[in-house]
């Protein structure tokens, strides 16, 4: 019975499931003929890990790139032709990489970043830069506390949650708001 059919997302952290609100935003942007671009910048991982902690951090960064890639494919499927996903690689096309990095103020210090850009009809492109490590994920860095055993090693970082949809959709909605926020400061007034 077609009415009872449904998809069950068994991927880690439900990365292939997007909320109804996200679907509506992407469909509205497509209806407005707005251009949505996602630019993925990958930082350097740097060869062989120094220790277990560094190896775990590298594994988390790779996992975040994979999860973000899967989520962006879903966004592209929903948004259709209005959504474009671009993966920038400094080694494959250095000139295009440099040009995009300058356009979006990306630096090597930003490591893995996702740029969410929107160009509405008749308006200039607006963008927001998101860090995959701090904006799209909840990571328990474990601190430098030993594991409890005598001579124990420091606890390793753990990827607790991937919040890619929340951050990306929030950035999209924020880019659609027109005008600059205004703050009024009153001096000498009692409340």
Task: Tell me the role of every PLM-derived stretch.
Residues 1-191:
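Short, surface-exposed patches at the edges or C-terminal ends of soluble domains, predominantly
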């Amino acid at each position: 019975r077609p009415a009872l059919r449904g998809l069950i997302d068994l991927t880690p952290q439900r990365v292939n499931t997007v909320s109804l609100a996200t679907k509506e935003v992407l469909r509205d942007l497509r209806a407005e003929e707005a251009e949505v671009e996602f630019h993925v910048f990958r930082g350097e991982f740097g060869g062989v890990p120094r220790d277990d902690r560094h190896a775990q951090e590298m594994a988390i960064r790779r996992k975040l790139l994979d999860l973000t890639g899967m989520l962006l494919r879903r966004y592209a499927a929903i948004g259709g032709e209005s959504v474009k996903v671009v993966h920038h690689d400094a080694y494959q096309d250095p000139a295009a990489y440099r040009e995009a990095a300058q356009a979006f103020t990306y630096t090597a210090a930003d490591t893995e970043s996702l740029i969410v850009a929107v160009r509405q009809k008749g308006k200039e492109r607006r963008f927001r830069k998101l860090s995959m490590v701090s904006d799209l994920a909840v990571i328990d860095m474990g601190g430098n506390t030993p594991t409890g055993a005598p001579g124990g090693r420091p606890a390793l970082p753990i990827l607790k949650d991937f919040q890619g949809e929340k951050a990306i959709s929030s950035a999209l909605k924020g880019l659609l708001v027109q005008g600059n926020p205004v703050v009024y400061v009153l001096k000498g007034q009692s409340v």
